Amino acid sequence: MRLRNRIVHASMSTRYVKQREVTDKLITYHRTRAVGGAAMIVTEPLGMLPHQLMAFRPALFDQENLDGFKRWAEAVESEDCRLIGQMQDSGRGHRQPGRNATAIGPSALPDDLSWTVPH
């Protein structure tokens, strides 16, 4: 991948997502960074699985959200900027109630903070 410069906008949670859906405000935020000179933008964490039901995290698993992701990518790409998706799973970490109903991880050992055992 070739970039127009070395400016990369790091991932950060904007909370511009509504009920796990990409919004116009989120798209405008990232497009503005591309117009301002960013050659690559790393998205905020994207929910990969249905058990990651955080209203402020864009849901990759939801087919109804595909149009929003497409509009988001097209808006950034139209400014000669690359949008890199940061997929996230909380893994075995499970410190907050409701944060990760089913802990997932490669180890059968419990999380050292919450003692949640991953599956």
Task: Annotate each language-model stretch with its function.
Residues 1-119:
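Flavin-dependent oxidoreductase catalytic cores
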